[in-house]
Amino acid sequence: AGFMPTFVIGGQLNSVGLNARLGKGKYLIAEADESDASFRYLHPMIAVVTNIDNDHLGTYDNDFNKLKAGFLEFLGKLPFYGSVIACIDDPVVKDLLPLFKRRTITFGITEEADFRAKNIVSSGLHSSFFVERRFAGSDLEVELSMPGKHNVLNALAAIAVASEENIADEQII
């Protein structure tokens, strides 16, 4: 999109060979997870929830309800004007949607998603699909240089965040 955000992520970003970079502008992208429960101390403006599963249960006394409560605590740190971008394809996330107390935008492959991938085609190391946007303009055609449903879902989440930030379609794609 032409931005150079600051980022801190768990793995190395292939395009720059780093897992963190001090960028320019107003955006900071942090990959936060529930592994040590420290995500509960963050105060994001927009939070993306891709899935909630029983990884790292030891941090939560092997109690899945405590893990879910940790996510709700994290999302409760969003300001009143903040947004949750949530994968409606994940059954646990879908069950918790009514408990999210902030504006919530869903993404996924299911028809009920606000940002829905359809006509997904994978060929070799590439994927292409159309994004049907319920509330944000016309469909977008997307081509990724990586295969896999998880990459399609991650792209949908990024498109939803960019749309929420009023970034023009031409910059998103």
Please state what every model-predicted region is.
Residues 6-9, 31, 85-86, 106-107:
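General beta-strand structural signal in soluble alpha/beta enzymes
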Residues 19-23, 39-41, 76-80:
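Conserved catalytic network of the ASCE P-loop NTPase/AAA+ motor domain
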